[in-house]
C-alpha cells in the first residue's frame, strides 16, 4: 500500500533519517525527517497564482503542537492558538533560506508547512524543518534547482571548539548561537547571537557550518533520486526583452533623474523612494498605452530595467544611488532623554531612517512568562519593534506586529542581550520599544543603536555601547561592490542584506540574507571587515552623546528592596488565605514577593511606600518586647480583661485594670471585638504577653506623659505620672513586692502582681520600659502608628516557589 523511500546518515553524534511515501501523499511533496528524537513532517503544495505578481508568493509555516513534547495545551479551549514568536522565527529561517533558490520570474503560489511531531529538546527543530522542506521540494516537481541544508552552530571560546547542532546544555555554555544554511557552493543565510566574538571567529563558524552540511546535501540528492520526482513543472521564463527595451526608451530619463539626485522625486510623494515611485508611474502608463503586455510582464520588465540601471551606475561610476562612497555612512543625529515621563529614551536618526526608542523598567513580576515547546521560562528583557505605515509615507491601517516586526525585534534583542547586566546586578525587568518613525533602509540597525542609547539613558549598566550597520552587495559576474549602511533602494535592488551589530570588542549579532544563490567566503570576509569599520564609526558618534550608563535610575522608576525574615514567620506575613500580605499591598500600593528562604522583595513606585510596607512586615514578624508599643485588634472579651491579637497572630491580655486610668464596671462597656487599639507590652511570661492600653495614647500610639509610680502613705505605693515621650523613657520606680493600690478613678483597687520578665527590676513587682523605647528606630522610624491596623495570621505556611502578591 505504501511506497516508502528511506535514506539515513550519521550526522554529528545522531542519526538523520529522511522518509517519504507514507504520510501526506496528496501533497506535491511530503517527507518526515528524524534527527535524534526530533521529528518534523514537511509538506509542499503549489498552484498557479490567482493574480499577476512580480514576486514569488511563498508561504512557510512552522507549527509546534503540544503533543510533540507530551503535553496538553493550557487555557480553556485546550488547543493551540496563534503561532508563538519562536514558531514565527523558525518559519522565517526556512523561508529566507529557500526563497533565493527559486528561478527568477517563477511566480506560482507555494505553501510549505513544517509540523513538529516530536521534540527531544536536544536536536534543534529549525535544522530538521529546513532539511525537511528542502527534501520535500526536491521530490515535488516544483522548479528548485539545488538542494539546501542548515545547521545550528555553537562555539566554546576557552576550548576554541565549534559544536554542530548543540544541545540545550551545550548551548548554555556556548558563546555563539548561530543558524547557518547553504548549498554545496555558497552561503545563503546566517542568523546568530554572539558574546562579542571577533570577525575571524564568526567567519570560522560559517565555514564550519558549510563543511558539515555537505553530507546532508548529498543525502538529499540521494533521497530525491531514489524517490523519483513527480512530473516536473516546466518553467519557461517570460520573454520580456521587448518590454524592457520599450521601458528603457520611454522612461529611462525619469529613472536616471530619480537616481542621480536622491532628493528629487519626480511625480511622486515626497516621502516615497524614487525607484518605487517611478515603478508605479511607469507600470500604470505603459499598460494603458501599449495594451499588448500584461501587468505582470510590465512590472517584471520595470524591475529588470531598474536593477540594470542602478547596478551599472554603481559598478561603473563607483558612486551609489545617493552619491556616497561604498564605505560611507549617512549623517547621524542623536538625542537622549527627550520623553519626560519615560524611564529612558533616545532618538536615533541616520539619513532618512529614524527610530524613537523608549524604555520602561518593571519588577520581576512584570517578566514575560513564556510557555513554549522549548520549556517554560521567564524573560526579563523584552524588545519590541514597531513599523507603522507612515514611516514610509503610506496610508494604511495599523495592524498587529507581523513576521517582519517580530524578526527585526528579535535581531535587535540578540544584539543587545549579551551586554546586559545579570539579574543579580540589576533585578529590574526591562522593556525596550522601538518606534520606527522614518525608514529608508536599516531600520533594525537603527533600533539597535537607539536601544543601546536609551538603556544607557535609563541607567541600565550596559557593558558597552552597541551599534549596528546593514551591508549591501552589488554583484555582476566577477565584479562586485560591498556597500555600507544601505538605503531602501539598495536593499530592494541589491543582492544581499548583511546586518552586523556589536561593540568595540566584537560582534553580538549577525544576520545575512541573499537574493542570489549564495556568495563566497571572500565576499563575507570583506563584508565583515567593512562592517567593523562602520560599526566603530557609529559607536564613536554615540559615545559623544552618552558614553556610559547614567548613575542610578530616575525617581519615578519602581523601587525594589529586599529584607530577610525568619522562615517560620512566612506564614504570619502571608496570613490566613493571604489576608495579611494582601492588606499590606492594598494599603501601601506595593507588590510583594516572598521566597521560601525568607527573602521578601518589595516593589513600589515610591520609596515611602516601600518603607511603609517594610514597617508593616516588621510589625508582623517582630517578637514582643517589654516597653514596645504595637497596633492590635480586640479578638476576645473576658470578665477580667480583653485579648488583643497583634504582630500577625500573637495574643496578649489587657487586664481590666490596664484598659483605662479610671474605674470601669465591665470590659464590654468600653471595648468590643474587632476594635483597633494601641498596646504597650508590660510583661512577658513564656508565651503569655501582658499588655496595657491606659499608658498609650490611642490616637497617636505614643506613651502618655507623667506615667510612673508614686508612694502614698494612706493608700500605699500607687501608680502616678512619669515623664516620657520621644526623648526616651526611664524605668518605673521600684517598690515592695506586695499588693499595690493605684490612684485614679473613684478610689484604689487591688492590682494583681505581674512578672515583668527580664525587664522587671528589684523584686519583680514593677514594670520597666527600656531607655531606648520611644527613640527613633532604624527600621520603624519615629512613626509608631505605621497605619497598619490589625494583622491576623494563622496559616499560609512557606511556599516552594516565590509567592507574588
UniProtKB/Swiss-Prot annotation:
Catalyzed reactions per annotation: RNA(n+1) + phosphate = RNA(n) + a ribonucleoside 5'-diphosphate
Keyword Repeat: no
The S1 motif domain, residue ranges: 627-694
GO biological process, one term: mRNA catabolic process
Domain KH: from-to ranges: 558-617
Binding positions for Mg(2+) per the UniProt entry: 491, 497
GO CC annotation: cytosol
Broad class of the protein's primary localization: cytoplasm
Subcellular location: Cytoplasm
This protein's record includes keyword Metal-binding: yes
MF (Gene Ontology): 3'-5'-RNA exonuclease activity; magnesium ion binding; polyribonucleotide nucleotidyltransferase activity; RNA binding
Chain positions covered by the region annotation Disordered: 702-805
Cofactor: Mg(2+)
Superkingdom of origin: Bacteria
EC number: 2.7.7.8
Keywords associated with the record: Cytoplasm, Magnesium, Metal-binding, Nucleotidyltransferase, RNA-binding, Transferase
Enzyme class: transferase
PANTHER family named among the record's database cross-references: POLYRIBONUCLEOTIDE NUCLEOTIDYLTRANSFERASE (PTHR11252), POLYRIBONUCLEOTIDE NUCLEOTIDYLTRANSFERASE 1, MITOCHONDRIAL (PTHR11252:SF0)
Function: Involved in mRNA degradation. Catalyzes the phosphorolysis of single-stranded polyribonucleotides processively in the 3'- to 5'-direction.
Family annotation (HAMAP family): PNPase
Family of the protein in this entry: Belongs to the polyribonucleotide nucleotidyltransferase family.
Protein's UniProt name: Polyribonucleotide nucleotidyltransferase
Organism: Anaplasma marginale (strain Florida)
